[in-house]
Amino acid sequence: MVPDEQLLARFFIPTKRERYAEMIGHPKKRRKFLCELAHFRSLDPRYLIPMPPKKLFPDQIAEILTKKGAPRSCWITSENSELDGKEMPLLEALNEVVGRQMGTLLTCIPGRLAYFEGEDMGCRWILERRD
């Protein structure tokens, strides 16, 4: 299973998984899915951890993710077409994403640990499953 599919299976609300699975695998439909990330409401709230208010900079977010087991690199799913579908160092990816108001998911450990940033104010979460 590729990182995008694991995101769907593990962090999206069950009623949306099938629809997004179909979209994410087709180039034209994928673009529509990526545009929805800006104001995304389909993440399963059971696995969302809000970012602490004083931990809003890329290096601080990277530190939190690293303490939770994130490796040095991550997979990017983003409405920013220059980043989408790429793997890059975690801190570099966070520097490109944080504060840019582009819906983006960074997969650190597929199916277990990710980061989401949306366009709306305060829309920054760590996604974590420990099961």
Name each model-derived stretch:
Residues 1-123, 128-131:
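Structured alpha/beta or helical-core interaction and ligand-binding surfaces enriched in interleaved
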